[in-house]
Regions:
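Dinucleotide-binding Rossmann-like beta1-alpha1 core, especially the glycine-rich loop
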Residues: 64-117
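Internal alpha/beta core interface subdomains
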Residues: 96-119, 123-138, 307-308
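Residues forming the flavin
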Residues: 1-83, 124-325
Length: 325
């Protein structure tokens, strides 16, 4: 099988690669290889059974079109000050322009036009004063809440757009290896579950996300591809009654707080706050289960949950921080 561009993984990075190519008028043949299902076919049995049934071969929440994002809290943080290391790679101004552009794409596919955390400046000042007294920094960050259920509708619209614009997507197909010739990637090896075949391509984009991080690390090691361990966030998810977080929920929707507590003074931050949300379970390889938070636009709980995370960059005494976490 041959194509012009093969993209491994139909998470946000893979999706937006194909989307941007089509929006810019590219007529190159694009193939996305995704081991999970189409977004409309992803259904977590726990919603019916009340318990995790350990779906095989993959968890429906973590794999499939749009990745874990289809079942997350569905929030867009609209400030370059929040998130990964993009500002250090391309600069703060370009990072903010990219965020704004990405936000406009979500809006074009039906995202809610409401932005949280930009009004009621006096109430924000009071929350900031309380944070300072507690030794914390409150980061200003506008939030667009898509909603867990609405995010799935938006990603379905994006999926249909790609299919209508001649992007081929192989669902239920796993990339098992890269095809390298004289140090150049010329394609990928794909397993359909019944057969294995090669896909030759002029360009290969590997966008496997967290779900494929271990696989990608092993591929890099096998082929001698230089790579560097990324940041690991280790922490807990906390759930409290809505009344405890009422002011923050109503004024900001999500608070972005940063602290450097004793004794180690490592950076600790709040993340993924879900007013009226639900704590969820996600399963990965080797029977690893972690928790996430969902926040629906319509269905609400009496609780608020959020993560408290400590970020680490390290490679001594080991160089597999994700496995350690």
């Amino acid at each position: 099988m041959e194509t012009d561009v093969v993209i491994v993984g139909a998470g946000p990075a893979g999706i937006f690669t194909a989307l941007e190519m089509r929006k810019r008028g590219s007529r190159q043949r694009i193939l996305i290889v995704e081991k999970g299902l189409a977004v409309e076919d992803r259904r977590c049995p726990k919603n019916i059974t009340g318990r995790c049934v350990n779906c095989k071969p993959y968890c429906y929440i973590t794999t499939g079109f749009s990745g874990a994002g289809a079942f997350s809290d569905g929030k867009l943080s609209l400030s370059y000050e929040v998130g990964g290391d993009l500002p250090s790679l391309i600069g703060e101004r370009k990072a903010q322009e990219t965020i704004d552009y990405t936000d406009s794409i979500y809006l074009s596919f039906g995202a809610d036009g409401t932005v949280e955390g930009i009004n009621n400046s006096e109430a924000v000042k009071e929350i900031r004063r309380r944070a300072i007294r507690a030794g914390l920094k409150l980061v200003d960050c506008p939030i667009r809440h898509l909603g867990t259920e609405k995010a799935q509708d938006i990603y379905y619209a994006i999926e249909q757009y790609l299919l209508e614009h001649d992007v081929e997507i192989l669902f239920g197909h796993a990339c098992t290896n890269l095809i390298l010739e004289n140090g150049v990637c010329r394609g990928v090896i794909v397993d359909s579950g019944k057969t294995t075949f090669d896909v030759k391509a002029k360009h290969v984009v590997v966008a496997t996300g967290r779900r494929g991080a271990d696989w990608l690390e092993s591929i890099c090691a096998e082929h001698g591809i230089a790579h560097q361990p990324g940041t690991v966030d280790i922490g807990v998810r906390v759930e409290v009654r809505n009344e405890v977080m009422e002011t923050v929920n109503e004024v900001l929707y999500e608070s972005k707080l940063i602290g450097y507590p004793q004794p180690f003074r490592n950076k600790v931050r709040t993340f993924c706050q879900n007013p009226g949300g639900f704590v969820s379970q996600e399963n990965y390889d080797n029977d690893l289960a972690v928790v996430n938070g969902h926040a629906y636009k319509e269905k609400k709980s009496p609780n608020t949950n959020l993560a408290i995370l400590c970020s680490h960059n390290f490679n001594v005494p080991f160089d597999q921080p994700i496995a350690y976490a």
